[in-house]
Amino acid sequence: MKGLDFGYQKGQQTLRDVSFSIGKGEMVSIVGRNGAGKSTLSKLICGFETPDAGEIFLNGKPLAEENIRRRARHIGYVMQNPNQMISKTMIYEEVALGLQRSGLTEEQIREKVEATLKVCGLYPFRNWPISALSFGQKKRVTIASVLVLDPELILLDEPPPGRISGTIPTSWSSCGA
């Protein structure tokens, strides 16, 4: 990311001259007060918003050349509220949803989904309705739904509930991060 500027209203910049790079395999937290622009930054990376200036790169290629659909092949985005992401009634179905049009066989989908559910500690609940889950468990389902797609970049707009040593989200670390 280089020289990124963005404002929702003309003359009021939310982000000004933001520049940084993240290496493959790195885990980075962007911390700030409410309204500091953390969610805005995620929206810009995903292509939901367009920067006023600057460029965003993924693997050295400018993301401006990619539409939202193509970016989604490379970027997994976990929203703050899992209820805004969940569209299926059962855990297994929700995690499998993103793979349905991937060209994988049903057996390959099953293997990937089950492996991801095991990593995220959700396998015993795979046939449960999502409505039976707590907010934190729903958040884990949305993380699993992103992890199963194996994106190059994963954005968590808000850390999941529960922490280890006050820094690493428990459910994120149990999902293999």
Language-model region placement:
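Conserved ABC ATPase "signature" region
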Residues: 107-125
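The feature captures the beta-strand-to-loop junction immediately N-terminal to the Walker
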Residues: 31-33
